[in-house]
Every structure is written in structure tokens, then in C-alpha cells.
């Protein structure tokens, strides 16, 4: 939900941003597009990073940096007007760059934690968060823009992201590493299609460095 709320910040605060920074419709068009360009460019590299370094580590960096670049958008008015628009474009570009691994990471986490027969429901839950975020955060961020100013839309969402980063580091684990995972539960999800050791490579194994056909089969099965 926070992922999509962060994306929507500029849509909500954009009118006030354009007015204060004296940005034309064309300039705002480029700024709005920056996120999508970066998101597109980073999608496949983001998936490669997830496969190489694991879901938790990559998602941690992704969450931290998208929160950082969201937070920093609240301070672009400190630059001279000639640079403020360029700074906002850069922040939005880096936001898209940072968020790109998130949905591939969600898919990997679902594959690692849920049996095949439960995977569709689990995926639907995290995908529905985008609509939940619009219903929950849009009116709140709109009020924030009106009551406190557009800068606080970005700073508040950035701080929320920093808090979530800390919680993510503390609470999220791989199935095989989770301190509260019982042997029975691990056996159950593993035997029913969960790829529990997805992020644990076996050094020196040819299978570890090549295509994981067994995992691909499990991911595609339903």
C-alpha cells in the first residue's frame, strides 16, 4: 500500500508543486514521466539483483532508497527555481529506479512462503494493496497538502517508509531462517510447492549458477 501511495504523492501535490516552483505543464509532464522511465529501465535488472542477492536484501535497499528519494522531494523548494524542477525530475527518476524491484520481490516472497494452492490468494492480497492505498492515503495526503503544505506530503510518506524499512529488517526472514518457523510448517509448505531455499545458494554447485529448472517448474505450476 505504501509503495503505491508514494507513487501517488506527486499526483496529489502536483498542482501546488507546479505553482510554487513555477513549472509549466510541459515541465510537469517530464517530471511525471521520470518515474515510469526509470521503473521500466530497472525492471529486468531489478529481477536479476533479486535472483543474485535475495529478496530480503534487495527489498531492504529498495524500500530505504524509495523512502529517501520521497523524503527529499519535500525539500526541492530550497533550490533556486532554475534547479528546483530539475531536482524534482531527478528525485522522481530515482524513486522509479528504487521501486522497480518491489513487485518482482513480492512474487519471489510469495513463491518462497506459500504452497502452490495458496499462491493465487496470497498474490491477490498484495496486489489489492494498490487499490487499498488509493482509498486510504489519497484523502489523507490531500488533506495534508491543504493543511500543512505540499512539502509534508513527501516528508511524511518518506518517514513512514523509513519506519517500514526498520520493521522489514527486523521482522522479515526467509522461511528456513525464521525464528518462529516450526519444522512441521516448513516441511508442509516445502512439500506443497513453496521454494523455501530460493535465496540460499549452494557454493560450487553447477545447479546454483545455472537455470533453476526445478524452481521454474514450481513457479509456473498451479
Positions of PLM-derived features:
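Extracytoplasmic
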Residues: 1-25
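Cytoplasmic helix-loop-helix junction between adjacent transmembrane helices
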Residues: 91-131
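Residue-level signature of mid-helix packing/kink "hotspots" within the transmembrane helices
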Residues: 8, 36-44, 100, 134-135
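Helix-loop-helix hairpin linking two adjacent transmembrane segments in secondary transporters
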Residues: 126-179
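Juxtamembrane intracellular "pre-TM" segments in multi-pass secondary transporters
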Residues: 175-222
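C-terminal ends and interior cores of transmembrane alpha-helices
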Residues: 64-81
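Membrane-interface helix termini in secondary transporters
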Residues: 16, 47-48, 143
Amino acid at each position: 500500500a505504501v509503495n503505491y501511495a508514494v507513487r501517488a504523492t506527486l499526483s496529489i501535490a502536483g498542482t501546488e508543486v507546479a505553482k510554487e516552483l513555477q513549472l509549466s505543464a510541459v515541465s510537469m509532464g517530464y517530471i511525471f514521466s521520470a518515474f515510469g522511465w526509470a521503473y521500466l529501465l530497472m525492471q529486468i535488472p531489478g529481477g536479476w539483483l533479486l535472483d543474485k542477492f535475495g529478496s530480503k536484501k534487495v527489498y531492504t535497499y529498495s524500500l530505504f532508497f524509495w523512502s529517501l528519494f520521497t523524503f527529499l522531494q519535500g525539500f526541492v523548494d530550497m533550490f533556486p527555481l532554475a534547479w528546483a524542477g530539475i531536482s524534482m525530475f531527478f528525485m522522481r527518476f530515482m524513486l522509479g529506479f528504487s521501486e522497480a524491484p518491489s513487485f518482482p520481490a513480492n512474487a519471489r516472497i510469495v513463491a518462497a512462503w506459500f504452497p502452490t494452492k495458496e499462491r493465487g490468494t496470497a498474490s491477490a492480497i498484495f496486489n489489492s494493496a494498490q487499490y487499498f492505498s488509493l482509498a486510504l492515503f489519497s484523502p489523507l495526503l490531500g488533506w495534508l497538502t491543504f493543511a500543512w503544505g505540499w512539502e509534508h506530503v513527501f516528508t511524511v510518506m518518506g518517514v513512514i517508509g523509513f519506519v517500514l524499512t526498520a520493521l522489514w529488517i527486523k521482522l522479515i526472514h526467509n522461511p528456513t531462517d525464521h525464528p518462529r518457523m516450526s519444522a512441521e510448517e516448513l516441511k508442509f509448505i516445502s512439500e506443497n510447492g513453496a521454494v523455501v531455499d530460493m535465496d540460499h545458494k549452494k557454493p560450487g554447485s553447477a545447479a546454483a549458477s545455472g537455470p533453476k529448472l526445478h524452481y521454474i517448474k514450481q513457479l509456473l505450476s498451479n
